[in-house]
Amino acid sequence: MKLAFLVCNDFFVTRLMDLLHAAGIDYYTRWDNVKGKGHGTDPHLGKGSFGSTNAVLMIAFEDEKPLGKLIDDIERLNAETARRDDHVRLFQLPLERIV
């Protein structure tokens, strides 16, 4: 089992949700208006010069096949997206248990 955290600018949540739908994933936990800064990207602080924020989705995968499709789709989308700041990020971790 795997746990994935997906992070993107709030502006691009619709395209991220489209990727989930295309991969057959209809389960997630979502946090909106998340503040932060990635390596080599602009801050997303929700105010001032850095007024944007991020969205974070947490998805638990018992079956890793949809995760593989999602990763492929994110890599394709990111390759087509010029600005690194606009890329979708996926962080994958082992998941020991779902209760």
PLM regions and their residue ranges:
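Positively charged, small/polar-rich N-terminal and surface patches that mediate targeting and assembly
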Residues: 1-99
